């Protein structure tokens, strides 16, 4: 409407114009996101996410496997710290080892995420306590899982197909450097274009 352009048929989404007007808008109740990778194998770890006004659910499509970017993330955090605190030193691994239990647990989940992580963003905005296996939150977990599954179906997420996920994982993990990724003839347009099969 603002740009006077014609919407693309079949593309998910809706106008943001109501958000530019004064007052509150009941524009949406849930926000969805997906992640695959930024640079081939070094950080390939596909995840999907949904959140409402209070809770956030993350689904890891390669659950209980080591997150390939865990070590790189710690290295980046260490570098950032050294740039800011040139006079002090930090042994990040030692700091994590000696941290309070909830901090250690958060790093353990980051290193090897389970299938589902559920966080109460009002009570736990930094996402330290995974509530996915807490009986008290079963209803919330199931509701958000259903919303996420519906969104993945509606958007035709190709990684609903187990074979497509397996092929993409194998192809991406076969590339170890960004420079190799640029030269690689990627096959994923072929196998990701097949119809999705729900789990």
Name these PLM-found stretches:
Residues 95-116, 121-127, 131-199:
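Long, internal low-complexity/basic segments
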Residues 3-117, 139:
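C-terminal cap/loop subdomain of S1 sulfatases and analogous C-terminal strand-loop tails that border
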Residues 1-4, 21, 123, 153:
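Residues at helix-coil transition
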């Amino acid at each position: 409407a603002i740009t006077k352009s014609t919407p693309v048929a079949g593309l998910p989404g809706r106008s943001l114009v109501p958000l530019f007007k004064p007052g509150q808008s009941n524009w949406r109740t849930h926000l969805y996101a997906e992640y695959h990778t930024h640079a081939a194998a070094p950080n390939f770890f596909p995840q999907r996410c949904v959140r409402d006004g209070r809770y956030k659910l993350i689904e890891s499509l390669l659950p209980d496997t080591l997150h390939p970017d865990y070590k790189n993330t710690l290295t980046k955090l260490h570098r950032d710290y050294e740039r800011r605190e040139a006079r002090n030193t930090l042994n990040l691994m030692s700091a994590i080892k000696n941290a309070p239990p909830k901090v250690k647990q958060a790093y353990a989940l980051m290193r090897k995420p389970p299938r589902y992580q559920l966080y109460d963003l009002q009570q736990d905005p930094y996402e330290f306590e995974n509530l996915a296996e807490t009986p008290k939150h079963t209803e919330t977990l199931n509701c958000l899982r259903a919303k996420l599954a519906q969104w993945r179906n509606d958007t035709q997420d190709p990684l609903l197909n187990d074979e497509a996920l397996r092929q993409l994982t194998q192809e991406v993990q076969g590339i170890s450097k960004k420079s190799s990724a640029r030269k690689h003839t990627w096959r994923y347009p072929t196998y990701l274009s097949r119809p999705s099969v729900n789990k």
